[in-house]
A protein has these predicted regions:
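Bacterial N-terminal signal peptides
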Residues: 18-34
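Generic low-polarity alpha-helical segments
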Residues: 1-3, 24, 166, 328
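Sequence-pattern detector for short linear motifs
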Residues: 12-15, 25, 51
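N-terminal secretory signal peptides that target proteins for export/translocation
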Residues: 1-20
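Noncatalytic, solvent-exposed loop/strand surfaces
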Residues: 38-499
């Protein structure tokens, strides 16, 4: 009898141990899973975030702010730059360029020299005279300025500068339209190094403590009308990929991120016969990872082209605008390409090959699920959320399309008083955020019906797209970088500090 009792006790002990181990294993898995989610939330490694579809997941992200409300910290950033902040390991990285002497101030609005050109044409001026006047008013030429390019590293929680590096001093490789900046390309990080790219100038790598790892100079190529540059780099494993569409030789190239040496380069002839005369582009490449393969999707003047990881062309699509700027992105298993102002919005299935361009009167084919004619935008990139694709034009027209069918569910002007939009919209907690160039953020309910909820105002020019990091929203204006964070109400707590 005692033997039987002992055996039963032993069985219960083993059973209890098994249950304990299962529970512990489940708890461990949940904990590790939460760590993974948490790590994803506190990382914003590139322009438009880890998925190139800026949607926040944290429930405490603030939907109201001003220059004082829900501001955890703010920091004045010297100089000017429309690059977006990126975040990793509790550090915020942002680039800027200061100018010795006077600099042409940026402009707000949707007059990108076109109306001025039309006005001069009515006066009967020659093309050379028009170009001279437009350049004098709107273009800052390399010979007119000496620049200092900086990379700043800030503490995410305090906003304090941990270090700053001046990585280049001298004349820029080309001019800029006063709407642009001399450092509009956003850096990218793998968590160990931060990589800085200035088109037609060079690539730089720094470790997390600011120690330079390498620098690769790049040839200077002319940009259409000296408008400046803006295509950010992308990381794929050990490769740092850039796209440089210019007036001399368009190309896509990959560099070893550890040494900075070029691994491959593919020259591009974008557009071809019957396509735009200008060859410059400003769209950032998108790394599309899907079940069939990983590919690099690029948009250039007149055409979109996708490449494999060795630089070989996979497919191409015509119908893009002459001045491509919006970035492609993926959502729900499909690729979305904004063809630019006055051009279509495309939804594409994985596995395309060859020329997938639409024929006359076609809106879909074997690889293009749907397209919406003239739904493209000039500057902001679209964003997708809960079955809808939201498209914002530079003039403040907001449209929503069904992500699967392309059916338009609404199209409306956000606010007649809003001057212009350059920043790409973002989404979290069932709210869409559209930041105007004047620093006003229009907060709109997501869904099939348009509903403007309220407006937040920072009262400063804003052209850079933000970063969403955990429960923080980082907004860069012309003069400052803000960390927007919902204030936690606690006994004896004061207002959030402003650095």
């Amino acid at each position: 009898m005692n033997t039987v009792c002992a055996e039963l006790k032993s069985i219960r002990t083993v059973t209890d141990l098994c249950i304990f181990l299962r529970v512990a294993g489940l708890a461990c898995a949940l904990f590790l899973g939460s760590l993974t989610v948490h790590a994803q939330e506190i990382t914003w490694p590139q322009f438009r975030g880890p998925d190139s579809n800026p949607v926040g997941a944290h429930a405490r992200l603030a939907d109201r702010w001003s220059k004082t409300e829900n501001v955890e910290w703010s920091l004045e950033i010297p100089g000017r730059g429309w690059s977006s902040p990126i975040v990793t390991g509790g550090k915020v990285f942002v680039t800027t360029a200061t100018t010795e002497g006077k600099s042409k101030p940026p402009q707000i609005g949707t007059e990108y020299s076109n109306e001025y050109v039309a006005e001069l044409q009515k006066q009967g001026l020659s093309m050379d005279q028009i170009l001279e006047r437009v350049t004098a008013r709107d273009i800052e030429l390399p010979k007119e300025v000496k620049l200092h390019y900086f990379l700043y590293c800030l503490n995410l929680t305090s906003g304090k500068v941990e270090w700053q590096k001046e990585f280049y001093t001298g004349q820029p490789p080309g001019g800029r339209h006063r709407k642009n900046s001399f450092v509009s390309e956003s850096p990218v990080t793998d968590g160990k190094f931060v990589y800085v790219y200035v088109a037609n100038l060079g690539l730089w790598a720094f470790d997390m403590q600011g120690k330079p790892a390498w620098n690769t100079p790049l040839e200077a190529n002319p940009i259409y009308l000296d408008f400046g540059t803006g295509s950010s780099p992308a990381l794929i494993g050990n490769l740092l990929v850039i796209v440089n569409d210019n007036e001399k030789q368009q190309y896509i190239a990959a560099f070893d991120k550890q040494m900075g040496k070029q691994v491959w380069r593919t020259n591009r002839d974008i557009g071809g016969k019957g396509q735009p005369v200008q060859r410059s582009g400003w769209s950032t490449p998108f790394v599309w990872r899907h079940a069939l393969r990983t590919e690099v999707v690029t948009i250039g003047p007149g055409e979109a082209i996708s490449y494999d990881l060795a630089g070989k062309e996979l497919w191409r699509l015509s119908g893009m605008a002459a001045t491509p700027i919006p970035m492609p992105f993926a959502y729900g298993g499909l690729l979305y390409i904004d063809g630019g102002r006055g051009r279509p919005l495309f939804a594409i299935r994985p596995g395309a090959a060859g020329d997938i361009s639409l024929g006359k009167d076609e809106s879909s084919n074997a690889y293009i699920i749907w397209s919406q004619a003239r739904a493209g935008t000039y500057l902001p990139s679209p964003v997708a959320y809960q079955g809808g694709v939201y498209v914002l034009t530079e003039t403040g027209i907001l449209s929503r399309y069904d992500a699967k069918t392309g059916t338009m569910t609404y199209k409306t002007r956000i606010d007649p008083a809003a001057a212009a939009f350059t920043t790409s919209p973002w989404i979290y907690n069932d709210k869409l955020f559209c930041l105007s160039e004047e620093g006003q953020t229009f907060v709109i309910a997501t869904g099939e019906k348009f509903q403007l909820l309220h407006v937040n105002d920072l009262d400063d020019m804003s052209l850079a797209s933000p970063a969403l990091v955990g429960e923080r929203l980082l907004i860069r204006t012309e003069h400052r970088l803000y960390s927007i964070r919902r204030q936690r109400l606690a006994a004896g707590a004061g207002t959030p500090s402003t650095k």
